Amino acid sequence: MKKKLILGLVMMMALFSLAACGGGGDVVKTDSGDVTQDELYDAMKDKYGSEFVQQLTFEKILGDKYKVSDEDVDKKFNEYKSQYGDQFSAVLAQSGLTEKSFKSQLKYNLLVQKATEANTDTSDKTLKKYYETWQPDITVSHILVADENKAKEVEQKLKDGAKFADLAKEYSTDTATKDNGGQLAPFGPGKMDPAFEKAAYALKNKGDISAPVKTQYGYHIIQMDKPATKTTFEKDKKAVKASYLESQLTTENMQKTLKKEYKDANVKVEDKDLKDAFKDFDGSSSSDSDSSK
């Protein structure tokens, strides 16, 4: 949940709340003069208007072509909630967000994702090329501790026959996983800290346990729960396609998709103050317009 995103959501809500209220009222009164709703709205529109009108417009365009269900949004929401654990509610509250407003942003992100996926080549030829270097997801559990001495202590207890899940609950500082035996969600290449990923993929059999691994978070001891099993292209095709599509969700590809969708939607900006809002999508600018007059 990036700080810029959170700030943007807050500003968007404030901007359009002011628009809905209409002009005329004062938001601040001083002996030196008052700040009116109109002044505040105009200032916020000037600073944030282009960014927000882009999103609102693309919500209309993409929402007309692609389906994002409440279940899709809830799933992504719960992923964030799990990621931030006990701090999630505090992050929302400190940012002036509600679950509803955050879910609204998530829905937009998912619309962009679906549009990008729909505009991505997933022919067998493309997927077979990707399959040559593709690795399946794996599932591991881990015990995270702060220092090497504690990691070695846990490692010795495992060698002495202690159960991994019991030690995760007792020692792990990862509050999101410790009560579940330390088990993480399935992941593939490029999703974890490089040192963690290398050590995890080096475990070939279920039940294999790594030596302590140092990352920016501390020291991990990793247990393989479900190793990677690559079979044949036809059998793995569904997973390969999902992995390939995810790999294509780059900023560049999403921008290309939005440009295409914008062009197909016949967009006309009626507000002269926002005439440059879509210059990155149609190649126009106010200077171009002025020079053509």
Swiss-Prot record:
Catalytic reaction list: [protein]-peptidylproline (omega=180) = [protein]-peptidylproline (omega=0)
Compartments where located: Cell membrane
Keywords for the protein's UniProt record, in alphabetical order: Cell membrane, Isomerase, Lipoprotein, Membrane, Palmitate, Rotamase, Signal
Signal peptide: 1-20
Enzyme Commission identifier(s): 5.2.1.8
Residues covered by the PpiC domain: 135-226
Residues bearing a lipid moiety (S-diacylglycerol cysteine): 21
Name by which UniProt lists this protein: Foldase protein PrsA 2
Classification of source organism: Bacteria, Bacillati, Bacillota, Bacilli, Bacillales
Gene responsible for this protein: prsA2
